[in-house]
């Protein structure tokens, strides 16, 4: 005991003490050994991150800025602006200026809120921020140019930033969220209240999904639900592009369901949409087990969420989904432990302060690569802080 007391526990050991893996006691010949072994390996390799100074995400900033270590020249920036790959912003003497054009004004407003929150601590700089759904800088593009986008795949060099949706700007879901999901700090409180009303033991053990057909990758789950409704309750809802029942796989569109009502279910599915799905972070706060389909599209906080530690990874074609659902139903304690870790990560590391902190760190580091002094464009206007938004 004396020797043990003097040993330094590695982070993964501490994690196992906090969240013991019940499955470790199962027979090695268990039907579910493959999945249990994956969980054990994931926990052994997992390094919990600090809550200080949003340090969880420093690696993301470093990786995204690596292509620009040779410097960002005035000529390079002029080319980005000329191509109109996003909205051009300038920060000069702690004031924010912008060109008049913005494709989605509410999205720009959501971005501007966070920049204005930290602008007193930022040096002069300029940047192009893309508020479209899709990234703009494929890796084959030469030269690599700096464009900020909220989401990307490994095939892009875009610099990720926390999406406008943490404050405002959609996506609109009629009639539940006509102006978007609203402020993240307020919505998370609603979700946590709902989670408290639906503890694990009271949740429905049918897997659940409601969403529009923004990607055909969602089809197999809808079809499985029609075949086995006790296993999965999944239906398509309408979106702005809906024209006929063909857009909901031959069935009438289901009604939209408020995200707080998702908390009634143990197992919740997340799919990509056009890009990364905005629902992902919300699902964890239900205290439910998140099934994350595919790993291609990411936002800035995704890399620190680990498969088998915080969520159940599902193949893009959903070929493994039935077996995974059978596994979690047969190993309820394991499922609950993963759900707890996922929920705690979002609670601890994706607070509004973390979003603001990320913006500050990102822009501060980015500014170091500008190889010239920024000159204000005369036709740009100053963005003034607006009155605090509190509506959902």
Curated annotation (Swiss-Prot):
Q: Which residues are glycosylated?
A: 53, 204, 373
Q: Which residues participate directly in catalysis?
A: 133
Which top EC class is named for this enzyme in its record? transferase
User: Under the GO molecular function aspect, what terms does this record hold?
Assistant: EGF-domain serine glucosyltransferase activity; EGF-domain serine xylosyltransferase activity; glucosyltransferase activity; UDP-glucosyltransferase activity; UDP-xylosyltransferase activity
From the record, give the transmembrane residue ranges: none
Task: Show where the record puts the motif Prevents secretion from ER.
Answer: 389-392
This chain belongs to which protein, by name?
Answer: Protein O-glucosyltransferase 1
Which species is the source of this protein?
Rattus norvegicus
């Amino acid at each position: 005991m004396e020797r043990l007391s003097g040993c330094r526990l590695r982070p993964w050991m501490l994690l196992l003490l906090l969240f013991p893996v019940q499955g470790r006691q199962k027979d090695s010949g268990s039907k579910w050994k493959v999945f249990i072994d994956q969980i054990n390996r994931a926990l052994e390799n997992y390094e919990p991150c600090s809550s200080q100074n949003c340090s969880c995400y420093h690696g993301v900033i470093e990786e995204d800025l690596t292509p620009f270590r040779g410097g960002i020249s005035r000529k390079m920036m002029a080319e980005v602006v000329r191509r109109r790959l996003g909205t051009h912003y300038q920060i000069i003497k702690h004031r924010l200026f912008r060109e008049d054009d913005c494709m989605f004004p509410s999205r720009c407003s959501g971005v501007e809120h966070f920049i204005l929150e930290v602008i007193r601590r930022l040096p002069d700089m300029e940047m192009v921020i893309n508020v479209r759904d899709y990234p703009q800088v494929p890796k084959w593009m030469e030269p690599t140019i700096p464009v900020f986008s909220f989401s990307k795949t490994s095939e892009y060099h875009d610099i990720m930033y926390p999406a406008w949706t943490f404050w405002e700007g959609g996506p609109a879901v009629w009639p539940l969220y006509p102006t978007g999901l609203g402020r993240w700090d307020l919505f998370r409180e609603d979700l946590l209240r709902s989670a408290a009303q639906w503890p694990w033991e009271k949740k429905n053990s049918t897997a659940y999904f409601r969403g529009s057909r923004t990607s055909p990758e969602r089809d197999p789950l809808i079809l499985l639900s029609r075949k086995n409704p006790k296993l999965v309750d999944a239906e398509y809802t309408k979106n702005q592009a809906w024209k006929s029942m063909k857009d909901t796989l031959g069935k009438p569109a289901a009604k939209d369901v408020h995200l707080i009502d998702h908390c009634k279910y143990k197992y919740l599915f997340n799919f990509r949409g056009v890009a990364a799905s905005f629902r992902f972070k919300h699902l964890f706060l239900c205290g439910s087990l998140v099934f994350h389909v595919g790993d291609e599209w990411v936002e800035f906080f995704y890399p620190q969420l680990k498969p088998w530690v915080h969520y159940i990874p599902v193949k893009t074609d959903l070929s493994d989904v039935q077996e995974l659902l059978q596994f979690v139903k047969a190993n309820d304690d394991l499922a609950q432990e993963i759900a707890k870790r996922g929920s705690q990560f979002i609670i601890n590391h994706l607070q509004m302060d973390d979003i603001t902190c990320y913006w500050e760190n990102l822009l501060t580091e980015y500014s170091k690569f500008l190889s010239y002094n920024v000159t204000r464009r005369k036709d740009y206007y100053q963005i003034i802080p607006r009155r605090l938004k509190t509506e959902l």
